[in-house]
Regions:
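Short amphipathic
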Residues: 1-10
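Conserved beta-strand core positions
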Residues: 4, 33, 59-61
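Amphipathic alpha-helical interaction surfaces in cytosolic regulatory modules
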Residues: 12-32, 41-57, 75
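C-terminal structural segments of small proteins and small subunits
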Residues: 52-89
């Protein structure tokens, strides 16, 4: 099992498009991939679950990967998460 702490860009969160993109990427891996914001936990392969996560107050989230391709999966998801920008109105 691999656990990574990731700091998102200021104001960024899992709104519709980034959540969908991340879920599509996550489904390419066998590993179980979970993202937590505080006490809330979501399956990274489920866009709706990601969208339900609260906006991280300090931008900090935790990514947990467990499975045969956990290192590759965690690296790919971290890269994708770091590109998420805040939703412009």
């Amino acid at each position: 099992m691999l656990i990574k702490s990731i700091t998102m860009r200021p104001g960024a969160h899992f709104h519709a498009r980034p959540a969908a993109d991340l879920a599509v990427l996550a489904r390419q891996f066998e590993s179980v991939l979970l993202i937590s914001v505080g006490e809330e936990l979501a399956d990274a392969k489920n866009a709706l679950a990601l969208m339900r996560l609260p906006k991280p107050k300090d931008g900090s989230i935790e990514l947990t990967a467990s499975g045969p391709d956990e290192e590759e999966a965690a690296a790919a998801l971290e890269t994708q998460i770091l590109t998420i920008e805040r939703l412009r109105k």
